[in-house]
């Protein structure tokens, strides 16, 4: 919590951490994203990979950023947690934030994205509306074929 929120005046002032505010933030994020803990205030290293992933995503979304760049947001989490994370990303975008999601999970891409761009061989294909692109199109673009061949 602390490194991400070091500039938050409610959490840190003059180099000192407000431990009560930090603990309250951690509890709020854990509750919102159903991060179950074996003890009340565990260190991050005590959380499983999936629990840590949910917590990190929750921590970032808690600040309601205007821009969020997220890589593999549902990696390592169960299906229920993945649905919660995806819905939170959709809600953030619906509130006007720009969300750039990098994912290898096509189901996730089709569930969350408005537009899809594919990187192949170091080149970025033009972004296309998700409604105008198929899994086959994405596969062809991933193979490095020209965009018109994927249409």
Residue ranges of predicted features:
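Glycine-rich phosphate-binding loops of nucleotide-dependent enzymes
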Residues: 1-151
């Amino acid at each position: 919590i602390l490194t991400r929120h070091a500039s938050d005046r409610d959490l840190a002032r003059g180099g000192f951490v407000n431990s009560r505010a930090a603990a309250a933030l951690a509890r709020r994020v854990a509750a919102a994203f159903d991060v179950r803990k074996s003890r009340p205030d565990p260190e991050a290293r005590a959380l499983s990979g999936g629990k840590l992933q949910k917590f990190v995503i929750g921590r970032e979304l808690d600040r309601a950023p205007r821009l969020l760049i997220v890589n593999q947001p549902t990696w390592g989490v169960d299906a229920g947690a993945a649905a919660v994370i995806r819905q939170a990303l959709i809600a953030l975008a619906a509130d006007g934030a720009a969300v750039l999601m990098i994912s290898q999970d096509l189901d996730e891409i089709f569930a969350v994205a408005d537009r899809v761009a594919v990187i192949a061989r170091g080149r970025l294909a033009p972004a296309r509306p998700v409604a105008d692109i198929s899994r086959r199109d994405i596969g062809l673009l991933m193979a490095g074929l020209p965009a018109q061949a994927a249409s």
